[in-house]
Amino acid sequence: MEPFGARLRRAMDERGPLCVGIDPHASLLAEWGLNDDVAGLERFSRTVVEAMADRVAVLKPQSAFFERFGSRGVAVLETTVQEARAAGALVVMDAKRGDIGSTMAAYAESFLHKDAPLFSDALTVSPYLGYGSLKPAVDLARESGAGLFVLALTSNPEGGEVQHAVRGDGRSVGATMLAHLAAENAGEEPLGSFGAVVGATLGDLSSYDLGINGPLLAPGIGAQGATPADLPRVFGAALRNVVPNVSRGVLRHGPDVTALRTAADRFAVEIRTAVTAS
């Protein structure tokens, strides 16, 4: 399979960089008039895929909202991933997995092995058992043509106590993760497959080298307070590689498919305007 970075760059060029989250939490199901059960989960997920999969570059299901329903919820997640990919969207599985050795390898196989029922184009992972603990996922992603998004500078305020902590060599933990990713992506064209999660809410990041030659998944737009107009200030010269993620800002307009598409299109235009004007 063609590497994830190349497929993502093409999707961003053709569809724009917007990523829409699939986050079926109980309050959102209620807003849609759906029960907080497997049937509601399935209806919600199918509607988002119908509305979005043929028009946005990336869909990002949050696995926890499916896992809470046990095996039946995971079955819905499998169908959601497969239908989204079949309709043309790239799927980033937001599972934030992180462990060591054979356990990390098993997590990787669950989402990155080409024959896995939950095979996704990319997976979010946590490096806070040490970046080297991610090696099984890095290796399998390369083999499968998939990608990773490593938590580096996240949008939640609590993340700073770890990610902004300064190591003995004077670099912050977040900067160290970015440096590892730059090394993974060295020489890759048109875009490396190993990205970072960098929050759009963080303000000026000019002290960080975001030039990792890989994608930057940017949560925080919409409900968390960031806007598309903030992207040039936050990401600077790396703006072209940013994949802005919007979840509630789009999903709250459901369950009407047309309303969901209109909301996504509005964000897409605002993002395009911000990128073009920078």
Curated annotation (Swiss-Prot):
Active-site residues (renumbered): 96 (proton donor)
Functional pathway: Pyrimidine metabolism; UMP biosynthesis via de novo pathway; UMP from orotate: step 2/2
Keywords: Decarboxylase, Lyase, Pyrimidine biosynthesis
Superkingdom, natural source: Bacteria
tRNA processing in keyword set: no
InterPro entries per record: Aldolase_TIM, OMPdecase_AS, OMPdecase_type-2, OMPdeCOase_dom, RibuloseP-bd_barrel
Broad class of enzyme this protein falls into: lyase
UniProt-recorded name of the protein: Orotidine 5'-phosphate decarboxylase
Organism phylogeny: Bacteria, Bacillati, Actinomycetota, Actinomycetes, Kitasatosporales
